[in-house]
Amino acid sequence: MNKNGNFKSTVGFVLACVGSAVGMGNIWMFPYRLGQYGGAAFLIPYLIFIALFGLVGLSAEFALGRMAKTGTLGAYAYCWKNKFGKYIGWLPLLGSLGIAIGYSVILGWVFRSIQGVLTNELLTNDIPAFFTNMTQSFSNVPCHFLVLFVTCLLLFTSATNAIEKVNKVLMPAFFILFIILAIRVSLFNGSIEGYKFLFVPKWEYLFNKETWIMAMGQAFFSLSITGSGMIVYGAYLKDDVDIPKASMQTAIFDTIAAMLAALAIMPAVFSFGIDPVSGPSLMFLTLPEVFKQMPLGNFFALFFFISVSFAGITSLINMLEAVCESWQNRFHISRKKAVLVCGIITFIISVCIENGDIVGKWMDVVTIYIIPFAALLGAITIYYILGWKALKQELDKGRKKPVGPTFKFLGKYVYVFLAIIILILGILYNGIG
């Protein structure tokens, strides 16, 4: 049963879910893929998949959490109603913990970059050398510790109250800061080339299977559909909230965040004649080089990394909350003890994988194998083990009009099938998210 209270408002709930969904993938992957796979043409499959996964994927996980009134472990046990059900939820929970461990390392790099900007180290010295030094084994322990200390401190008290308040501040701040960055970047000479890269449609890419594969993977992982994290937020949801509507609002704001990141990043990269890339190199090597060359570069670099830290912290809160809530209920311990134990375990493991190559391999295993399998497990559990009748009853709460047979078809057959495809393609392509 839910021991951590409920979200006080639908706005607070949606912002918390947006906070979970908006993360590194929106910032360092979406802008590059948007340009690389056809510009505006890429948006067609991307928006189709975002709408589909938001409607029937997020809604299903929220509904399961609210119905079971508990998070990952309890929700799977609620559905399966046998001994198997007591253990099956551990895989999605492992995914949440695994991604949190890797995420905390990357957020540690963000915090170290903020420190580097404030101390004038980052932009006045050799940027690749700064990044190399930062990503060595045990080279960033203080900033790494600070990331987990801040996150656990925010989770230490009442779960829903803290999560709601934090996201009501950090998510609007994230959007405001990125809007400011996007406006400033639009004034650069040569920024038009970045807009062309992003938005000039290359319609031939619609006939390229990789465009659809990458759009599907980007949309799926962008919404934090993991069979775990969004279930626990659903457990904190009141019965009068329209879940499908809230799910689509989450998907819309997540897409806006990704577009803002694209508008702030790629025109800046092109205006300074730097080749666009994706992944950590974009955030920690390419963009600092851009900031180094622009007027008031330190100021805008600080803006950027603070914005990224907001997105990262709100995502990490959800990952750790999924674990803490489950441990709190499974082992009958206090919330403070659950948060403390989770924080210590996360820190000990993540410190050992601080090396950039090691954490990269760690994240590959988690995102290519564990998370997609856990998401598939969640989809099957909700649409086939729990069943449509019970799910529909929960989805109809708070709605003026009940969900119809189209929702059932899209969820039970299209969504579950695509979850299988995403798992297979992720392995074949060595990651599509």
What are these regions (language model features)?
Residues 1-29, 57-62, 66-78, 83-87, ...:
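Membrane-interface "cap" regions at the ends of multi-pass membrane proteins
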Residues 2-7, 11, 164, 168-313, ...:
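Membrane-embedded translocation segments of transport machinery
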Residues 2-5, 33-37, 67-91, 104-162, ...:
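Inter-helical loop and helix-membrane interface segments of multi-pass membrane transporters/permeases
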Residues 6, 12-14, 20, 138-142, ...:
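Loop-to-transmembrane helix boundary motifs in multi-pass membrane proteins
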Residues 9-49, 228-234, 241-248, 252-255, ...:
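Transmembrane helix-boundary motif of multi-pass solute transporters/channels
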Residues 29-46, 80, 161-170, 245, ...:
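Transmembrane helix-loop boundary segments of multi-pass membrane transporters
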Residues 74, 107-135, 236-240, 245, ...:
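Helix-loop-helix connectors at the membrane interface of multi-pass transporters/channels
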Residues 88-93, 323, 330-343, 365-427:
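C-terminal membrane-solvent junction of multi-pass transporters and transport-like membrane proteins
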